[in-house]
Amino acid sequence: MAYPLQLGLQDATSPIMEELTSFHDHTLMIVFLISSLVLYIISSMLTTKMTHTNTMDAQGVETIWTILPAAILVLIALPSLRILYMMDEINNPALTVKTMGHQWYWSYEYTDYEDLYFDSYMTPTSDLKPGELRLLEVDNRVVLPMELPIRMLISSEDVLHSWAVPSLGLKTDAIPGRLNQATISSNRPGLFYGQCSEICGSNHSFMPIVLEMVPLKHFENWSASMI
């Protein structure tokens, strides 16, 4: 989860988020090197009296500044495409959960069970218990088994929403009349918080998401108690 005054990304909880974090560091290093080179060239031009105003043709330099940016773009594009395809890939999910966005709450349906569905509303500030987080707690958490591939089917009942959990590397639009898919796989148990990430009306900021990742045995006990 996020912390006050935190700089950088949240701790990765899923393999996809670990890949995204590595890609972020990879791209940031390229940006840093390019920025350093540009600043060095600018400072050299401003601090030296050595100038050459008679150059009419420099094919070697033009070749370098054409090939080098192309190579840099390839170094960015290849890992980006790899992660993009990984995010869409899912084989034999252990569980499927249908998520519907509403103004202004989420509803969840465990499609592998006959009567396991519920609505999830934000807990009012006046009802919070000690240690709970303002604007992030809900009355019904989404309980899921850890270390298993889970398919989330995401849509909306009214307007555009977006179902996002940063520590899992998830952000999928909820579009009326369209079913989008996302994959969840958590490396560890815990509570993971998210929010609606698409402006959807006056109470947009009051649509938190709470995932509770637990061992498979605990999930089976919870699902049996809910049916």
Swiss-Prot record:
Q: Where are the transmembrane segments?
A: 15-45, 60-87
InterPro entries the record matches = CcO_II (IPR045187), CcO_II-like_C (IPR002429), CcO_II_C (IPR034210), Copper_CuA (IPR001505), Cupredoxin (IPR008972), Cyt_c_oxidase_su2 (IPR014222), Cyt_c_oxidase_su2_TM_dom (IPR011759), Cyt_c_oxidase_su2_TM_sf (IPR036257)
Residue ranges, Mitochondrial matrix compartment? 46-59
Q: Spell out the molecular function terms from Gene Ontology.
A: copper ion binding; cytochrome-c oxidase activity
Which co-factor is required? Cu cation
**EC number(s) stated in the UniProt entry for this protein:** 7.1.1.9
How does the cofactor attach, per the note? Binds a dinuclear copper A center per subunit.
- Gene Ontology CC: one annotated term: mitochondrial inner membrane
Q: Which UniProt keywords apply?
A: Copper, Electron transport, Magnesium, Membrane, Metal-binding, Mitochondrion, Mitochondrion inner membrane, Respiratory chain, Translocase, Transmembrane, Transmembrane helix, Transport
Sequence positions that bind Cu cation A1: 161, 196, 200, 207
Q: Which family does it belong to?
A: Belongs to the cytochrome c oxidase subunit 2 family.
Q: Per its record, how is this protein called by name?
A: Cytochrome c oxidase subunit 2
Annotated source species = Acomys ignitus
